[in-house]
Amino acid sequence: MLTLVFLEKVLKLLEDGIPVRQGKFFDDELKMLHLSQFLTSKPILFICNVDENSIRKGNGHSKQVEALAKILEAPTLNISVSIEQELSEISDEKELKELLFEMGMDSTGLEKLIQTGYSLLELCTYFTSGPKETRAWTIANSTLAPDAAGKIHTDFKKGFIRAETVSYSDFLSAGGWLKAKESG
């Protein structure tokens, strides 16, 4: 239920030209904010399409966008669509990594966009793995294990006993679930 005090607080922010997402709210107000779905409460991400020489440091236009984004407390990404097109055509992982290294990049723009989007939306991925398949599930960062299990199937939440976890990097370095479990 929205309160008059809360709505007046939001109105004051908007009248002052301040996006609702930049307001300071108490926990109970944050719940009201989530229910109200104000457009300016939504997170923002600025993506600048730049030439290949401007990926790391940007250019005059992207610097203007970065200045605005700083005021709005929003992240920015410089991505070169022409480079992304070129990278998307490379199927060999080793060749892709070499090309990224030559360009002074640690990951593709698409990967950065996904990582930034997940962070901005406070999401994470968890994997379920069995003998036949491994599957990825997207959940909110604050999701508890029983609720995450319920994302797969409601019966899993009802019958939840425990979660056995291993980080993705540990899973890969150990060479699978059993070896990761054995190594602790």
Regions found by a protein language model. Name each.
Residues M1-G184:
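C-terminal-of-GTPase-core extension/linker across diverse P-loop GTPases
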